[in-house]
Amino acid sequence: MPKGKKEKVERRQRIHDSIRESMFGTSVRPRLSVYRSNEHIYAQLVDDMEGHTLTSASTLADDVEGETPTEESRSVGELLAERAEDAGIDKAVFDRGGYKYQGRVRALAEGARDGGLQL
């Protein structure tokens, strides 16, 4: 039976909630949270103990380059790793946000690793 948009969103949210139960970010090893929309991708390093964002990056930034959305996602990962290094962060826990680890989500993670962030 084909699923509609509402069912897909609810399923992704259930998966995200179950992942978040076992994942926790600290100021030493924050959580790299990913949100993917149809046009953009957003990533942020979150300290769950304090409840605030340490640094973030998205495809809305001017320094993000790439011809395809996957290339842009890799560039976002590299930009986030650079900003994390400036903030003194070298390790993070990867929170894929309920999305499959493929395509733009995977490219972002690989870009962050290439930028020097240990996931």
Curated annotation (Swiss-Prot):
Keyword annotations from UniProtKB, A to Z: Ribonucleoprotein, Ribosomal protein, RNA-binding, rRNA-binding
InterPro entries xrefs: Ribosomal_uL18_bac-type (IPR004389), Ribosomal_uL18_bac/euk (IPR005484)
MF (Gene Ontology): 5S rRNA binding; structural constituent of ribosome
Gene Ontology CC terms: cytosolic large ribosomal subunit
Residue segments, region Disordered: 54-76
GO biological process: translation
NCBIfam families: L18_bact (TIGR00060)
Family: Belongs to the universal ribosomal protein uL18 family.
The protein's assembly and partners: Part of the 50S ribosomal subunit; part of the 5S rRNA/L5/L18/L25 subcomplex. Contacts the 5S and 23S rRNAs.
Task performed by this protein: This is one of the proteins that bind and probably mediate the attachment of the 5S RNA into the large ribosomal subunit, where it forms part of the central protuberance.
Record-given protein name: Large ribosomal subunit protein uL18
Species assigned in the record: Salinibacter ruber (strain DSM 13855 / M31)
Lineage: Bacteria, Pseudomonadati, Rhodothermota, Rhodothermia, Rhodothermales
